């Protein structure tokens, strides 16, 4: 193995890695020894010195050593093993809920034990629940760790101890095999070498300040952060360069349809809408595919911008596809576009996963023949059996639900006769600038930063759940006395449609009993699209006073007469999602209110979140705060897609580096194409597939 590059050494060559463990490691994208070395600790534990048991404070993680006094199993309520140890300064109780007979036998009275865990205050003094422990041999001095102990991101069935043992082997291989230095010499001068940085981060010496590691300021981290941010930026440059190699249909100015639609509208587009449409039209006139992200706050009128872009393509005899994240939103878009486009003689088709049999087949034929010029749907519109007829523009609504990989797969899908469609991506989740510069560096960005006239800011109040009866009275007053409509939103912490639906049904029953004079509707994610649509339609037509809903109404629902929203358990949602929900009211000229009905006690973070919503109606301010509170991955909705999942970099903490990283990435992209490719392969193997497309 001597002299081999570690990206070519499979993990199966390490001792103890068989087929079963290989499969588990593959789930966290660990295939080679290089992958393992770049799988960095989440945090560290200091197990290098002993704490006297008598000095343990609650909440402190510590290593203690003591002699076993007794070890007992109790069966009251829950089966449990307790073991007491003493070091002369005090007694510690170790509690285990999962244990075996072998564990009980190893902890015999008189044995010496080294244990590590979080100290808690128990009934009989200090205790630790499920500490890691080791029975000591006959040594008079305990065997303490010589380095800080790493804690790695892991997956089911892979223990920390396994990852530590494998990493030990991988670090040993650094002596005989190479991990390639990919930074050009002018960049890496004065920096730690890559092997040095990896050794330091996997096995930090006890002299190293934990605070340096926790804040990401250690030179070993800075070395890897720079490399990872460069790889990310280089992948975006490669995607952009790739896009420039493709051909799109140039769609020159043809404003006949656009002017007809504008003349029929009861309002004039805002200056911001007009500016963004001009930016889009400029892109669509070119023979390379447009890749543009349009950000607009809730209610800023993105749908009209999308419609005007669509008309440019349709005027040239081409097709347009609009993809939305949910069937409810897709159907609402289809209805909006039909209202605008039918008078212009344009046929709008709708395609969703739930459509079956003849109806689906008929819709597919209408798309393939070109009879339908505008196709609206969920991701179902990009399934194999859907054939387009001159698709020239793809519009993706709520980009934030689709990661970089979906964005690219969709693009490959749309190409026909050597042409790639133009792409327009719309999000109502404003993205802070530093994040947009990094996560969407392959896209040009437009911002609709002006609300249409006649919108009123929503007044937001936070009220404890103990005053629920007062809030129900407030709903009665708004609906009966003021003639308004209201939403009551149920949220659940579990990502479970079933539990969420059950919670909404229970609330619906409660409110029907409490408000017998009101017509109360219910909509949740487990209802059939037709049922949801019927409820939404009767709410929109004013037949229902109150709509009980889950977060399915988060995006796109437009009922101007609704001026009151109650959000239950708002502490369970992020700021961006709460702001989206709140955007369902305040769509008419009447003063609107949003009540955040929270459960006490509130955590510090939840208090900050609710305060931000009370203070601001500006989506961009809220997004920046959300980034500060939650971190970039959650904000981009990419915990699943891996788009913002960095191994060592942190977009919030490292944002000051981003402008310099972008400059360096351009330098490497132009001067060192081989290194650029290798950096992307090392840090972002998924993206590499696409930049070669």
UniProtKB/Swiss-Prot annotation:
Residues 283-448 form the Helicase ATP-binding domain. The gene is recG. Keywords: ATP-binding, DNA damage, DNA recombination, DNA repair, DNA-binding, Helicase, Hydrolase, Isomerase, Nucleotide-binding. The wedge domain within the N-terminus inserts into the replication fork junction, where the lagging and leading strand split. Residues 48-146 are annotated as: Wedge domain. GO terms for biological process: DNA recombination; DNA repair; replication fork reversal; response to radiation. It holds the Pfam family RecG_dom3_C. InterPro entries: ATP-dep_DNA_helicase_RecG (IPR004609), DEAD/DEAH_box_helicase_dom (IPR011545), Helicase_ATP-bd (IPR014001), Helicase_C-like (IPR001650), NA-bd_OB-fold (IPR012340), P-loop_NTPase (IPR027417), RecG/Mfd (IPR047112), RecG_dom3_C (IPR045562). It catalyses: Couples ATP hydrolysis with the unwinding of duplex DNA by translocating in the 3'-5' direction; ATP + H2O = ADP + phosphate + H(+). This is ATP-dependent DNA helicase RecG. SUPFAM superfamilies: Nucleic acid-binding proteins (SSF50249), P-loop containing nucleoside triphosphate hydrolases (SSF52540). It comes from Escherichia coli (strain K12). Plays a critical role in recombination and DNA repair. Helps process Holliday junction (HJ) intermediates to mature products by catalyzing branch migration. Has replication fork regression activity, unwinds stalled or blocked replication forks to make a HJ that can be resolved by RuvC or RusA. Also rewinds unwound dsDNA in an ATP-dependent manner. Has double-stranded (ds)DNA unwinding activity characteristic of a DNA helicase with 3'-5' polarity in vitro on linear dsDNA; branched duplex DNA (Y-DNA) substrates adopt different conformations that influence which of the two arms are unwound. A motif (DEAH box) lies at residues 397-400. Residues 482-628 form the Helicase C-terminal domain. It comes from the Bacteria.
């Amino acid at each position: 193995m001597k002299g081999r590059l570690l990206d070519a050494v499979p993990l199966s060559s390490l001792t103890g890695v068989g087929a079963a463990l290989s499969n588990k490691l593959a789930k966290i994208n660990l295939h080679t020894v290089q992958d393992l070395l770049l799988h960095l600790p989440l945090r560290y534990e200091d197990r290098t010195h002993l704490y006297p048991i008598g000095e343990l404070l609650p909440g402190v993680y510590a290593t203690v050593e003591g002699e076993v006094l007794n070890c007992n199993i109790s069966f009251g309520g829950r089966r449990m093993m307790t073991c007491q140890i003493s070091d002369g300064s005090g007694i510690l109780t170790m509690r285990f809920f999962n244990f075996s007979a072998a564990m009980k036998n190893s902890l015999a009275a008189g044995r010496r034990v080294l244990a590590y865990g979080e100290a808690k205050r128990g009934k009989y003094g200090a205790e630790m629940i499920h500490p890691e422990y080791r029975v000591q041999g006959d040594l008079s001095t305990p065997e303490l760790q010589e380095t800080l102990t790493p804690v790695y991101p892991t997956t089911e069935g892979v223990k920390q101890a396994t990852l530590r043992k494998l990493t030990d082997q991988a670090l040993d291989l650094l002596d005989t095999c190479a991990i390639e230095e990919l930074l050009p010499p002018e960049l890496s001068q004065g920096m730690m070498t890559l092997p040095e940085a990896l050794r330091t981060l996997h096995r930090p010496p006890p002299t190293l300040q934990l605070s340096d590691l926790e804040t990401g300021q250690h030179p070993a981290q800075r070395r890897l952060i720079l490399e990872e941010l460069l790889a990310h930026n280089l992948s975006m440059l490669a995607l952009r360069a790739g896009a420039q190699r493709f051909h799109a249909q140039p769609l020159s100015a043809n404003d006949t349809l656009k002017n007809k639609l504008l003349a029929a509208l009861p309002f004039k587009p805002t200056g911001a809408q007009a500016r963004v449409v001009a930016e889009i039209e400029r892109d669509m006139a070119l023979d390379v595919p447009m890749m543009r992200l349009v950000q607009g706050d809730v209610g800023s009128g993105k749908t009209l911008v999308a419609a005007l872009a669509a008309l440019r393509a349709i005027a040239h005899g081409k097709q347009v596809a609009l993809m939305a994240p949910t069937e409810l939103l897709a159907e609402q878009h289809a209805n909006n576009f039909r209202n605008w486009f039918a008078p212009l003689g344009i046929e709008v088709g709708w395609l969703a996963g739930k459509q079956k049999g003849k109806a689906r087949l008929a819709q597919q034929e209408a798309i393939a023949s070109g009879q339908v010029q505008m196709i609206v749907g969920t991701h179902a519109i990009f399934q194999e059996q859907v054939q387009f007829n001159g698709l020239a523009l793809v519009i993706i609504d709520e980009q934030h639900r689709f990661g970089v990989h979906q964005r690219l797969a969709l693009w490959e899908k749309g190409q026909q006769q050597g042409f790639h469609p133009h792409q327009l991506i719309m999000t109502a989740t404003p993205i802070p600038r530093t994040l947009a510069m990094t996560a969407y560096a392959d896209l040009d960005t437009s911002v609709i930063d002006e609300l249409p006239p006649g919108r009123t800011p929503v007044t937001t109040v936070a009220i404890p759940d103990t005053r629920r009866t007062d809030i129900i009275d407030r709903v009665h007053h708004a609906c009966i006395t003021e003639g308004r409509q209201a939403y009551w939103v149920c949220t659940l912490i579990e990502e479970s449609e079933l539990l969420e639906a059950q919670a909404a049904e229970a609330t619906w029953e409660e409110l029907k009993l409490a408000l017998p004079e009101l017509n109360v509707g219910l909509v949740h994610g487990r209802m059939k699209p037709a049922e949801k649509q019927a409820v939404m339609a009767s709410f929109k037509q004013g037949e229902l006073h109150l709509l009980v809903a889950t977060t399915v109404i988060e995006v796109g629902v437009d009922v101007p007469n609704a001026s009151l929203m109650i959000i239950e358990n708002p502490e369970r949602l992020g700021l961006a999602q709460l702001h989206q929900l709140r955007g369902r009211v305040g769509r008419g000229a009447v003063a609107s209110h949003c009540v955040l009905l929270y459960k006490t006690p509130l955590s510090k973070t939840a208090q900050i979140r609710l305060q931000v919503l009370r203070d601001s109606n500006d989506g961009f301010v809220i997004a920046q705060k959300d980034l500060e509170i939650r971190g970039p991955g959650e904000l981009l909705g990419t915990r699943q897609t891996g788009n913002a999942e960095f191994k060592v970099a942190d977009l919030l903490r490292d944002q000051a580096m981003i402008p310099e990283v972008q400059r360096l990435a351009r330098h490497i992209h132009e001067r060192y194409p081989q290194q650029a490719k290798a950096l992307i392969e090392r840090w972002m193997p998924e993206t590499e597939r696409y930049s070669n497309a």
